[in-house]
Amino acid sequence: MKHLATFVQMGCLLVAASLGFAACQGAAGRERARQAAWRKAIKAQIYSDYQGMYRQPTGVAFKYPYIAPGSRQYATVLWDWDSWWADVALRQILADCTGEAERSEALVYEQGCVLNYLAYTSPEDGYMPMVIDGESHPDLMKPADIYATNMHKPCLAQHAALLIKQNKGDAEWLRELFPRLQAFIGNYHQHHRHQASGLYYWQDDLAIGVDNDPSTFFRPKKSSASIYLNCMMYKELQAMQYIAGQLGLQPAVAQYQSWAQELLTSVRQHCWDEKDGTYYSADLNLLPYTGEAGIVFGKPFVLHEGAPRDYPCLIQRLGSWSGFMALWAGIATPEQAQRMVRENLLDERTFWAPYGVRTLSKLEKMYNLKPTHNPSNWQGPVWGISNYIVWSGLLNYGFEKEAKLLAEKCIRLYGQDLETDGCLHEYYHPETGDGLINPGFQNWNYLVINMIAWIEGRERIQEF
């Protein structure tokens, strides 16, 4: 009887295990079916209205056709990194479902984004505005002091390089205005770069792209060596090197290659935190050592002269998604990438959420999900662009399993949004997937198309 009871118990366990396995298989099958349905709905939506981002020239403001991010709020606006990322998505759409005629038509608008900005760029000082709208005028866009506030993010060369690379290396359309692009990069190198550390910094917190990132938001002027900015600048210098090569400008190739290598060294030295296993922004707001004597306790005294400060900056241990841009930019070493992903990205207490990557660690005191505009909220909500950049970085280092999980989170996010609201939003609640603000937003949300192409085993269009 004892053996019979044991046999019955084993049988019950096997049945329970089989039922559990079947339930898991059933749930997995239902999720696969939902993912397929969401991919189909997303593609249908985006393929049908991508031309809604095309805009025609309008007198003085826009000399060339261009791409607007989409939605009523941004209907006639050319934004720096917005139009660049929208174009990365557009390139995927064109590859997926159009022919040569549609691609030729789109190229005029794509190149126009770059050329419009260069039309506003001073060849003498390289100042380039970050935004152009229907009321802009090239002669009225400069601030009184161009070195006291931010300008266009370092991404225009990457936009141009994308188009050149996607069109068989043809850079002739850019040759005449390339000196203006060089002046723009020279402005950054001379006036936005901290000499002691080699890191680039924001002049202030105006329109930095990640509006209220605590590493820059309400910080002293010229104090934030943002990891976001430095990763973008590293890629920008590589893009300049590529474009100069396509134009046969070998001295410029050598210059940008040298600047890129110097920046890579600086970021690895000053922004990598061995303790936490990730990249952070750096704080430049340190008092200089003057060596001048003051009167202390009634006597001349040089404070700290025995061992003055010998470090140029302090690391900012603020858990922001932009630290993962070191994966996207190729700055992290393979060993660093392992720690960044295993110890930081995949931690559900901090960044890894049901609908993507939180833009600020949930453990930071500033974490919140307020639906704000001016500034837009980057202190926790999930954004399509941060999801995409982290995903792209994962693929750079061979984290395909994790990249697939993140892509599926993003597909679920947008698929459910289309089901419930019939449109996409600018940013989202990381736990529920609810759209928080700006319904009808297109722009970089369309980068989910690039994720879908990869998931489905098709050619994936990549940013430069």
Regions found by a protein language model. Give the residues of each.
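Glycine- and aromatic-rich loop/turn segments at beta-sheet edges
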Residues: Q51-Q73, T121-M141, Q190-F218, Q269-Y289, ...
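Aromatic-rich carbohydrate-recognition surfaces in CAZymes
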Residues: T76-Y200, I227-N230, Y234, G319-S320, ...
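Low-complexity, Ser/Thr/Pro/Gly-enriched N-terminal "stalk/linker" regions
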Residues: G26-L78, G112, N116, S266, ...
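Bacterial Sec-dependent signal peptides at the C-terminal "C-region" and cleavage site
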Residues: V15, L19-R30
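Catalytic cores of carbohydrate-active enzymes
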Residues: A33-K43, M128-P129, Q190-D204, M232-Q336, ...
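Solvent-exposed loop and edge beta-strand segments that line ligand/cofactor-binding
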Residues: Y64-W84, L107, P138-K153, S215-C231, ...
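Extended, well-ordered alpha-helical scaffold segments
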Residues: E31-Q45, G99-A119, D170-H189, E236, ...
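Non-catalytic C-terminal accessory modules of carbohydrate-active enzymes
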Residues: R342-A353, T359-K365, T372, S376, ...
